[in-house]
Amino acid sequence: MHIFEGFLPGPWWQIWWILSIPVFAYGIFRLNKLVKEKPEVLPLIAVSGAVIFVLSSLKLPSVTGSTSHPTGTGMAVILFGPAITSVLSAIVLLYQALFLAHGGITTFGANLMSMGIIGPFVAYAIYKTMMRLNVNFYVSAFVTATLADWVTYVVTSTQLALAFPANPGGVEGSLVAFLSVFAITQIPLAILEASLITLLFKYVLQAKGDLMVRLDVLTDSQVRKLKETKA
Protein backbone atom coordinates (compact mmCIF):
# COMPACT_ATOMS: atom_id res chain seq x y z
CA MET A 1 0.00 0.00 0.00
CA HIS A 2 2.98 2.33 0.54
CA ILE A 3 3.22 4.54 -2.54
CA PHE A 4 6.86 5.04 -3.49
CA GLU A 5 8.75 8.31 -3.19
CA GLY A 6 8.20 10.59 -6.18
CA PHE A 7 5.52 8.39 -7.73
CA LEU A 8 2.53 10.70 -7.16
CA PRO A 9 2.54 13.80 -9.37
CA GLY A 10 1.52 17.26 -8.23
CA PRO A 11 -0.90 18.44 -7.08
CA TRP A 12 -1.94 15.06 -5.66
CA TRP A 13 0.88 14.51 -3.19
CA GLN A 14 0.41 18.06 -1.87
CA ILE A 15 -3.35 17.56 -1.51
CA TRP A 16 -2.92 14.40 0.59
CA TRP A 17 -0.34 16.12 2.77
CA ILE A 18 -2.69 19.05 3.44
CA LEU A 19 -5.64 16.78 4.21
CA SER A 20 -3.69 14.56 6.60
CA ILE A 21 -2.09 17.28 8.75
CA PRO A 22 -5.22 18.32 10.74
CA VAL A 23 -6.05 14.71 11.64
CA PHE A 24 -2.47 14.06 12.70
CA ALA A 25 -2.46 17.21 14.84
CA TYR A 26 -5.68 16.16 16.53
CA GLY A 27 -4.20 12.72 17.11
CA ILE A 28 -1.19 14.29 18.86
CA PHE A 29 -3.58 16.17 21.13
CA ARG A 30 -5.53 13.00 21.95
CA LEU A 31 -2.36 11.01 22.56
CA ASN A 32 -0.90 13.60 24.93
CA LYS A 33 -4.18 13.77 26.82
CA LEU A 34 -4.39 10.00 27.15
CA VAL A 35 -0.81 9.62 28.38
CA LYS A 36 -1.26 12.36 30.99
CA GLU A 37 -4.52 10.90 32.28
CA LYS A 38 -3.65 7.20 32.01
CA PRO A 39 0.14 6.72 31.91
CA GLU A 40 -0.30 3.04 32.69
CA VAL A 41 -1.43 2.43 29.08
CA LEU A 42 2.00 3.34 27.64
CA PRO A 43 3.01 -0.33 27.24
CA LEU A 44 -0.12 -0.99 25.18
CA ILE A 45 0.63 2.06 23.04
CA ALA A 46 4.12 0.71 22.42
CA VAL A 47 2.81 -2.76 21.57
CA SER A 48 0.21 -1.33 19.18
CA GLY A 49 2.86 0.74 17.43
CA ALA A 50 5.14 -2.28 17.17
CA VAL A 51 2.34 -4.34 15.61
CA ILE A 52 1.81 -1.64 12.98
CA PHE A 53 5.54 -1.46 12.27
CA VAL A 54 6.19 -5.18 12.01
CA LEU A 55 3.13 -6.08 9.94
CA SER A 56 3.33 -3.11 7.57
CA SER A 57 7.01 -3.85 6.92
CA LEU A 58 6.18 -7.28 5.45
CA LYS A 59 5.87 -5.97 1.92
CA LEU A 60 5.14 -7.84 -1.30
CA PRO A 61 5.43 -6.36 -4.82
CA SER A 62 2.03 -5.34 -6.17
CA VAL A 63 0.66 -2.45 -8.24
CA THR A 64 3.30 -0.36 -9.98
CA GLY A 65 4.39 2.33 -7.55
CA SER A 66 3.07 0.51 -4.50
CA THR A 67 3.25 -2.71 -2.47
CA SER A 68 0.96 -5.16 -0.69
CA HIS A 69 1.31 -5.87 3.02
CA PRO A 70 -0.74 -6.06 6.22
CA THR A 71 -1.39 -2.71 7.88
CA GLY A 72 -1.52 -3.77 11.53
CA THR A 73 -3.74 -0.85 12.54
CA GLY A 74 -6.69 -2.89 13.81
CA MET A 75 -5.28 -3.32 17.31
CA ALA A 76 -4.56 0.37 17.84
CA VAL A 77 -7.95 1.37 16.43
CA ILE A 78 -9.83 -0.75 18.95
CA LEU A 79 -7.68 0.23 21.93
CA PHE A 80 -7.14 3.93 21.29
CA GLY A 81 -9.40 5.06 18.46
CA PRO A 82 -8.54 6.30 14.96
CA ALA A 83 -7.00 9.66 15.90
CA ILE A 84 -4.23 8.15 18.03
CA THR A 85 -3.83 5.38 15.45
CA SER A 86 -3.00 8.07 12.89
CA VAL A 87 -0.09 9.23 15.06
CA LEU A 88 1.28 5.72 15.54
CA SER A 89 0.93 5.11 11.80
CA ALA A 90 2.69 8.38 11.01
CA ILE A 91 5.67 7.44 13.18
CA VAL A 92 5.91 4.07 11.46
CA LEU A 93 5.50 5.52 7.97
CA LEU A 94 8.15 8.17 8.57
CA TYR A 95 10.66 5.63 9.87
CA GLN A 96 9.98 3.30 6.95
CA ALA A 97 10.35 6.13 4.43
CA LEU A 98 13.63 7.38 5.92
CA PHE A 99 15.37 4.12 6.77
CA LEU A 100 13.71 1.25 4.87
CA ALA A 101 13.01 2.84 1.46
CA HIS A 102 9.39 1.87 2.04
CA GLY A 103 7.06 4.70 1.04
CA GLY A 104 8.38 8.23 0.77
CA ILE A 105 8.34 11.79 2.04
CA THR A 106 6.36 13.36 -0.79
CA THR A 107 3.92 10.44 -0.65
CA PHE A 108 3.81 10.44 3.17
CA GLY A 109 0.50 12.32 3.24
CA ALA A 110 -1.15 9.90 0.83
CA ASN A 111 0.13 6.86 2.72
CA LEU A 112 -0.94 8.31 6.06
CA MET A 113 -4.38 9.15 4.69
CA SER A 114 -4.97 5.58 3.51
CA MET A 115 -3.31 3.48 6.22
CA GLY A 116 -3.46 5.80 9.21
CA ILE A 117 -6.64 7.83 8.76
CA ILE A 118 -9.42 6.62 6.46
CA GLY A 119 -8.84 2.89 6.99
CA PRO A 120 -8.84 3.23 10.80
CA PHE A 121 -11.78 5.66 10.91
CA VAL A 122 -14.01 3.39 8.83
CA ALA A 123 -12.95 0.30 10.78
CA TYR A 124 -13.57 2.07 14.10
CA ALA A 125 -17.08 3.04 13.03
CA ILE A 126 -17.82 -0.59 12.16
CA TYR A 127 -16.31 -1.79 15.45
CA LYS A 128 -18.43 0.58 17.55
CA THR A 129 -21.54 -0.46 15.62
CA MET A 130 -20.85 -4.14 16.18
CA MET A 131 -20.25 -3.63 19.89
CA ARG A 132 -23.50 -1.69 20.22
CA LEU A 133 -25.22 -4.68 18.62
CA ASN A 134 -23.61 -6.94 21.25
CA VAL A 135 -21.53 -8.86 18.74
CA ASN A 136 -18.84 -11.02 20.35
CA PHE A 137 -15.71 -8.95 21.01
CA TYR A 138 -13.37 -11.32 19.20
CA VAL A 139 -15.62 -11.39 16.15
CA SER A 140 -15.76 -7.60 16.23
CA ALA A 141 -11.97 -7.42 16.52
CA PHE A 142 -11.53 -9.76 13.55
CA VAL A 143 -13.91 -7.79 11.34
CA THR A 144 -12.37 -4.48 12.42
CA ALA A 145 -8.83 -5.58 11.61
CA THR A 146 -9.92 -7.00 8.27
CA LEU A 147 -11.75 -3.83 7.24
CA ALA A 148 -8.94 -1.55 8.41
CA ASP A 149 -6.74 -3.38 5.91
CA TRP A 150 -9.21 -3.60 3.03
CA VAL A 151 -10.37 0.01 3.28
CA THR A 152 -6.73 1.12 3.27
CA TYR A 153 -6.22 -0.55 -0.09
CA VAL A 154 -9.44 0.84 -1.52
CA VAL A 155 -8.17 4.31 -0.62
CA THR A 156 -4.72 3.63 -2.07
CA SER A 157 -6.32 2.37 -5.29
CA THR A 158 -8.43 5.53 -5.41
CA GLN A 159 -5.37 7.71 -4.89
CA LEU A 160 -3.53 5.99 -7.72
CA ALA A 161 -6.59 6.09 -9.98
CA LEU A 162 -7.04 9.83 -9.43
CA ALA A 163 -3.38 10.46 -10.23
CA PHE A 164 -3.23 8.08 -13.20
CA PRO A 165 -6.63 7.80 -14.93
CA ALA A 166 -6.82 5.13 -17.61
CA ASN A 167 -7.07 6.02 -21.28
CA PRO A 168 -9.67 4.89 -22.16
CA GLY A 169 -11.67 4.31 -19.00
CA GLY A 170 -10.74 7.33 -16.93
CA VAL A 171 -10.58 7.23 -13.14
CA GLU A 172 -13.21 4.48 -12.91
CA GLY A 173 -11.34 2.17 -15.25
CA SER A 174 -8.08 2.80 -13.46
CA LEU A 175 -9.70 2.18 -10.06
CA VAL A 176 -11.07 -1.19 -11.16
CA ALA A 177 -7.64 -2.18 -12.48
CA PHE A 178 -5.81 -1.21 -9.29
CA LEU A 179 -8.37 -2.88 -7.03
CA SER A 180 -8.23 -6.07 -9.09
CA VAL A 181 -4.46 -6.35 -8.72
CA PHE A 182 -4.46 -5.52 -5.00
CA ALA A 183 -7.25 -8.00 -4.29
CA ILE A 184 -5.09 -10.97 -5.30
CA THR A 185 -2.78 -10.48 -2.33
CA GLN A 186 -4.78 -8.30 0.02
CA ILE A 187 -7.86 -10.43 0.60
CA PRO A 188 -5.91 -13.36 2.08
CA LEU A 189 -3.35 -11.09 3.79
CA ALA A 190 -6.09 -9.16 5.59
CA ILE A 191 -7.71 -12.35 6.85
CA LEU A 192 -4.38 -13.64 8.17
CA GLU A 193 -3.65 -10.27 9.77
CA ALA A 194 -7.06 -10.15 11.43
CA SER A 195 -6.58 -13.67 12.80
CA LEU A 196 -3.25 -12.66 14.35
CA ILE A 197 -4.64 -9.47 15.87
CA THR A 198 -7.60 -11.36 17.31
CA LEU A 199 -5.18 -13.79 18.97
CA LEU A 200 -3.18 -10.86 20.33
CA PHE A 201 -6.34 -9.44 21.83
CA LYS A 202 -7.04 -12.75 23.51
CA TYR A 203 -3.63 -12.52 25.20
CA VAL A 204 -4.02 -8.82 26.09
CA LEU A 205 -7.44 -9.46 27.58
CA GLN A 206 -6.10 -12.25 29.78
CA ALA A 207 -2.98 -10.35 30.85
CA LYS A 208 -4.17 -6.73 30.86
CA GLY A 209 -7.95 -6.87 30.91
CA ASP A 210 -7.98 -4.10 33.50
CA LEU A 211 -6.33 -1.72 31.04
CA MET A 212 -8.96 -2.50 28.43
CA VAL A 213 -11.54 -1.47 31.02
CA ARG A 214 -9.58 1.71 31.78
CA LEU A 215 -9.57 2.51 28.07
CA ASP A 216 -13.34 1.94 27.87
CA VAL A 217 -12.83 -0.80 25.32
CA LEU A 218 -14.75 -3.28 27.46
CA THR A 219 -16.63 -3.24 30.75
CA ASP A 220 -15.64 -5.28 33.81
CA SER A 221 -18.48 -7.71 33.18
CA GLN A 222 -17.49 -8.16 29.53
CA VAL A 223 -13.89 -8.88 30.50
CA ARG A 224 -14.95 -11.44 33.10
CA LYS A 225 -17.29 -13.13 30.65
CA LEU A 226 -14.65 -13.31 27.92
CA LYS A 227 -12.10 -14.74 30.34
CA GLU A 228 -14.55 -17.44 31.34
CA THR A 229 -15.51 -18.47 27.82
CA LYS A 230 -13.62 -19.40 24.69
CA ALA A 231 -13.87 -17.17 21.63
From Swiss-Prot:
Pathway(s) it belongs to: Cofactor biosynthesis; adenosylcobalamin biosynthesis
InterPro entries membership: CbiM (IPR018024), CbiM/NikMN (IPR002751)
Membrane-spanning intervals of the chain: 9-29, 41-61, 74-94, 107-127, 135-155, 181-201
MF-aspect GO terms: cobalt ion transmembrane transporter activity
Gene3D superfamilies hit by this protein: 1.10.1760.20
GO terms of biological process kind: cobalamin biosynthetic process
Chief localization: membrane
Domain of life assignment: Archaea
Cellular compartments per GO CC: ATP-binding cassette (ABC) transporter complex
Subcellular location: Cell membrane
Topology class, membrane: Multi-pass membrane protein
Alphabetical keyword list: Cell membrane, Cobalamin biosynthesis, Cobalt, Cobalt transport, Ion transport, Membrane, Transmembrane, Transmembrane helix, Transport
Aminoacyl-tRNA synthetase in keyword set: no
Record-linked Pfam families: CbiM
Protein family according to the UniProt entry: Belongs to the CbiM family.
Subunit composition and interactions: Forms an energy-coupling factor (ECF) transporter complex composed of an ATP-binding protein (A component, CbiO), a transmembrane protein (T component, CbiQ) and 2 possible substrate-capture proteins (S components, CbiM and CbiN) of unknown stoichimetry.
Task of the protein: Part of the energy-coupling factor (ECF) transporter complex CbiMNOQ involved in cobalt import.
Protein name per Swiss-Prot or TrEMBL: Putative cobalt transport protein CbiM 1
UniProt organism field: Methanosarcina barkeri (strain Fusaro / DSM 804)
